[in-house]
Amino acid sequence: MSAKTIKVGIIGQGRSGRNIHAHGLVRLKDKFTITAVADGLEDRRKRAVEEFGCNAYATWQEMVENEQLDLVVNASPSDLHFPISLELLKRGINVLCEKPLAKTPEEVDQLIAAQKSGARLSVFQQSRYMPAFLKMREIIESGVLGRIVQVDFTSNGFARRWDWQTLQSNNGGNLLNTGPHPVDQALQLFGTDLMPQVTCIMDRANTFGDAEDYVKIILRGPGRPTIDLEISSCSVYPRAQFTIQGTNGGLTGNSSKLTWKYFKPDEAPKQELITQPLVDKNGNPAYCSEQLTWYEDNWENVAPEGMNAFEVMTNTLYKKLYATMTEGAAPEITPEQIRQQMAVMQECRRQNPHIYTTA
């Protein structure tokens, strides 16, 4: 694409289409132009015209048939992500789809195949660019924590919920609603080249719908860290959002602040395995004991003026998408990667037939 400004159409003007995407694109006027929106509610269409100076349509079909768009953002309700994205790709239209991309890996396969039209499918997994997550990856890759044994991802709180995203028919529930963010991060650390062994427990605690609002997932694999991922709506005392256990130290924190602590093996006392009972200098039974020199560091997120961490993630994703569409930069988030995410979630549903009769 040679055009320097990408013409965007947005499907949906709700919490995602307006509050996340449209407001994010307004910050990047040198790269993107909101040309049109589509929403079934008249008041939302009127508001979009006033706020963004764009055209507005009642249906996405009208929008794409009447506008020359370079990109369509699919921020429709979750259960419509797959069918609308599939139709757009078949029409040769580039798509940026909100999470969840689909419900099953088979649906993702159809979306990947539909790119034969020449259109590109991108996925809005903006948490991949969470500053705290990027810092975590930097710390892990530095090696100071040693071999990573376990990583915990926790998205917990206490809430009762009774809206459309509590229904299975709408692709609701904590797994498909909140899950795409931490599961994507977890799989980035686990590795996208191997399907993990999945263990999952689900419950319906405080939801008024038929989908789950408690999810516990354990991911394992040879030579990979164990992933402990929890999404709960019944946690009055939530744990840290991130916890890492390593052979030389560990990390804890959240999207705002991280703290990590480690020792340096080359400074540690030299030890050898002793197979006989341990005794102290007086000959009394003893436990293993040593003095390690610990190093501790921390990081705090400092967002650019006028932006919060969430807006930074959105801004980063759109800038990278722009580079892919106009400069030929390789995409960092691919539907092939998200297929693994859908496969993990499908296995989670399969293991919980008391909630999901079909995976």
Language model feature labels by segment:
Residues 264-305:
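Charged, glycine/proline-rich intrinsically disordered loops and linkers
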Residues 177, 184-269, 307, 315-329, ...:
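Contiguous beta-strand/loop segments that form the cofactor/metal-binding neighborhood of enzyme cores
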Residues 1-52, 354, 358:
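N-terminal Rossmann-like dinucleotide-binding module
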Residues 110-126, 147-152:
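Rossmann-fold dehydrogenase core element
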